[in-house]
Amino acid sequence: MMKAPRGTQDLLPGTVETWQYVEEKLRDMSARYNYKEIRTPIFETTNLFTRSVGETTDIVQKEMFTLVKKGKDEYTLRPEGTASVVRAFVTNKLFGNPDQPTKLYYMGPMFRYERPQKGRFRQLHQYGVEAIGSSDPAVDAEVISLAYSIYKSFGLQKIKVVVNSLGDAESRNAHRDALIRHFEPVAGELCQDCQSRLYKNPLRILDCKVDRDHPSMKTAPSILEYLNEESKAYFEQVLAQLDALGVAYEVDPTLVRGLDYYTHTAFEIMSEAEGFGAITTLCGGGRYNGLVQDIGGPDMPGIGFGIGLERLILALENEGVLPELETGLDVFIVAQGEKEVELTATRLLQLLRMEGFKADRDYQGRKFKGQFKQADRLKAKFTVILGDDEVERGAAALKDMTTGEQVDVPLSAVADKIRELSEGAGQ
């Protein structure tokens, strides 16, 4: 029997409605903050990700799905959304718009070759925002506030916001040198990945899952000790803006993001709920002031974040805040009789759909009893009953499936009667 590829899942009716609910709320929150949707290809040139995400990152070294090469260009399924959005920003010259920052959001599948586990897939789905074109600390705070507000809008309570500053280039270089001096004496005790990163990108050592309990991690120099005055002032303004927005946060100097393009502000939103699992990060993001220029555009700053939808839904389930979703039909037509009954059912079904009702009928030739059972399974609020007698009289029996009450209605008035009864019952 054929199965879905490892690390993927089929979203079936009964489950996909939850996804639609989540996606609709995300679109609503995006609109409140004036973010417009952008849709980019699911594959890009491999070079885009090696240049932007970073050659020493786990994503580039271990997790990318690169397509079999045909022709001169090599393509990779997108492992994250920011690089593609920034590429589209440059390609389509959105930097020429008079109103900056350009505020964009995206939603769609990403692909990473990693070990599947609870809430983590090889085809994952991500929502994210990018605000490109402003270096105002208030934009950093707004982006963090949007992410925080999204989780609160779903009713999640057991979350926390963690922030850090990675500083500007001068600050990062000073911190980089300090990290090399710190880890050099114990390099032989670290994993192979950390050893290879020591001189290329020592900041990534702090994000290592293998060596996170090594004593040297606890005593590693903090980036906050190496921020120059400009970076320190910028971070203080971000925190002041967060205070003004009412966003509670913790400053964690050990927080680094797994992508190389981050500068200044970095943040994560984490779950503190029991039973959520070992991976508690729900959302991550930060500022990337050099990325637009690296991809071939002008020197313009940006900031954004990404939310994994699988992990968001897992958090909603874990805290028990998913609402009961309306998935049933408005009306089901129960019809049995001669040919004219069938044709009348077909005409009435189309009329009801054009009137805006979610409607269906039996296509298996079931008897009345079987059709009523089908209406129950489909959670129909009303059934319209048609037989030879009803059609001959130009009428139908309309049954409220909640109360069991049944009335005769002229065929021409069925839609209006359903609407009247629905409004009266508050359905």
Curated annotation (Swiss-Prot):
One of its GO terms (molecular function) is ATP binding. It is an enzyme of class 6 (ligase). It catalyses: tRNA(His) + L-histidine + ATP = L-histidyl-tRNA(His) + AMP + diphosphate + H(+). One of its GO terms (cellular component) is cytoplasm. It is found in: Cytoplasm. Belongs to the class-II aminoacyl-tRNA synthetase family. This is Histidine--tRNA ligase. It comes from Exiguobacterium sp. (strain ATCC BAA-1283 / AT1b).
